Amino acid sequence: MFPSSDDADPVNADVGSEGQFAPWLYVRNADSPVEEEKRFPNDESVTFRAQVDAWLGHIFPGASANAASISGTSYSRLEFRLGRSSAWSRPANIGYGLSYAFPLVVALLSAHKGQIVVIDSPEAHLHPRAQSRMGEMLAQFANAGVQVLVETHSDHILSDARLAVQKKALKAEDLALHFFSGAQEGHGNGIVSPTTHSDGRLSDWPEFFFDQAEIDLMALASH
C-alpha cells in the first residue's frame, strides 16, 4: 500500500523523496490528457495512464502499471506486469528497476512547463539499454519545457542527452553539465562545466569525467 499526502501537491508533481506518493498522483491524473510534446513518439494515446505505460514500455519492453485507490482508506495499491498476458504483480515481486522508474515517469508526466523535477541516479537498477532509453525520455521532457535536474554516474544517460542535441531533439543551450571532481589544491573548487556544441560535442572533457570505459578498452586493446 502507498499513502496519499496532505503535503504533496499534485500541481507541483510531488511524488515524494522516495516516490511514495507516485501511485496517489497516478490515480489523480489517470484519465487526464497529456500535452502532445510529452507523449511517447508516434503513440496515439493521450491519457496519463496510457502514457505511463508507453514510457515504461519503452524502458522495459512489455511493461505496464496500474494503481487504484483502496476503498475506505487513504491508501493506493500499485501493480506491474511485463506483458499483456502476464499476471499483475506487486512491486515487491518484480524487478526493482521498474519500481524505481515508475515515480520518475509519473513526476515527469505530471510536471508542467517551467517546473523543476529533481532526479537522483535515474540509471539505478537499469541495464545499459534501459539507461539509454531513460536518457532519451529525460531529453524529451527537457525539450518539452520541464526543468530536469539530474545527478548521474551513467555515461549512457550523458551520451543520450548529447545525442538528443545532435539530433536537434534538444537545444544545446538547454543542456547544462557540471562535473564535481572535488576541490584540489591549485585547481579551484573542483567544478567543471563544459558547454555543449550543436553537434553534441563538449567544449571540455575533464579527467575522470565519464572516461573509465574508454580507459579500460584502451588497456584491453594494448595487450
Residue ranges and their predicted role:
Residues 58, 136-144, 158-223:
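RecA-like P-loop NTPase motor core
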Residues 1-101, 107, 112, 195-223:
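Phosphate-coordinating catalytic segments in nucleotide- and nucleic-acid-processing enzymes
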Residues 119-122:
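Walker B catalytic motif
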Residues 103-106, 156-160:
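Short amphipathic alpha-helical face segments that pack within enzyme cores
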Residues 113-116, 145-149:
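Loop/turn-to-beta-strand initiation segments
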Residues 151-153:
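H-loop/switch region of ABC-family ATPase nucleotide-binding domains
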